[in-house]
């Protein structure tokens, strides 16, 4: 779990991993506006923060169902392909379920996020407020049946509109 001492370290990690500062600014804004649900870090054996992920609330057709959006997910380049992102995501999913969050969405590469169990959100009748590439908007039921009987447009926290 993110600790106060991790905030600036996470900011530096995100700025080093992504092409622009947009993700770092997003995380800072979500944190400042209390729109983050879960923020986890992965550390090296030496205690260096080498990975980070964050979840924030989303709505379906303007209604809160305790669903979450995963963004961003980052691992330092020299630590990639070692299962760090997988561990972060699995730990996060377990924590989200423990706290009563039954479903999650993500916007990203289907081949990558499919490894974690995400499927095209359209299979669940869900769409994103933004125009995104086919298959990039994905969803997962953390609790079986959580998305059943729901359909419509997913909106992220307002901070995402600044990306």
Please provide the spans of the model-predicted regions.
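Conserved acetyl-CoA-binding loop-helix of GNAT-fold acetyltransferases
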Residues: 70, 75, 81-94, 105-106
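A conserved beta-turn-beta hairpin within the catalytic core of GNAT-like acetyltransferases
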Residues: 58-70, 80
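Active-site rim helix/loop that mediates acceptor-substrate recognition in acyltransferases
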Residues: 7, 15-59
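C-terminal "cap" of GNAT-fold acetyltransferases
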Residues: 3, 127-163
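Short loop segments at secondary-structure junctions
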Residues: 44-47, 78, 141-146
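Conserved active-site alpha-helix within GNAT-family acetyltransferase domains
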Residues: 98-102, 107-133
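A short beta-loop-alpha structural element at the N-terminal edge
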Residues: 1-10
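Conserved glycine-rich acetyl-CoA-binding loop
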Residues: 48, 76-87, 99, 115-116
């Amino acid at each position: 779990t993110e600790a106060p001492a991790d905030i600036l370290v996470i900011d530096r990690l995100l700025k080093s991993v992504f092409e622009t500062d947009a993700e770092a600014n997003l995380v800072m804004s979500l944190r400042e506006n209390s729109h983050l649900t879960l923020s986890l870090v992965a550390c090296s054996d030496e205690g260096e923060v080498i990975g980070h992920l964050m979840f924030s609330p989303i709505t379906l057709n303007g209604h809160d169902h305790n669903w979450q959006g995963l963004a961003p997910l980052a691992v330092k380049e020299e630590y990639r392909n070692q299962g760090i992102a997988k561990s972060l995501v699995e730990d996060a999913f377990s924590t989200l379920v423990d706290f009563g969050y039954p479903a999650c969405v993500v916007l990203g590469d289907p081949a990558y996020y499919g490894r974690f169990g995400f499927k095209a959100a359209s299979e669940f009748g869900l769409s994103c407020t933004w125009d995104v590439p086919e298959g990039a908007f994905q969803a997962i039921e953390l609790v079986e049946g959580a998305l059943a009987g729901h359909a419509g447009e997913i909106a992220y926290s307002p901070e995402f509109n600044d990306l």
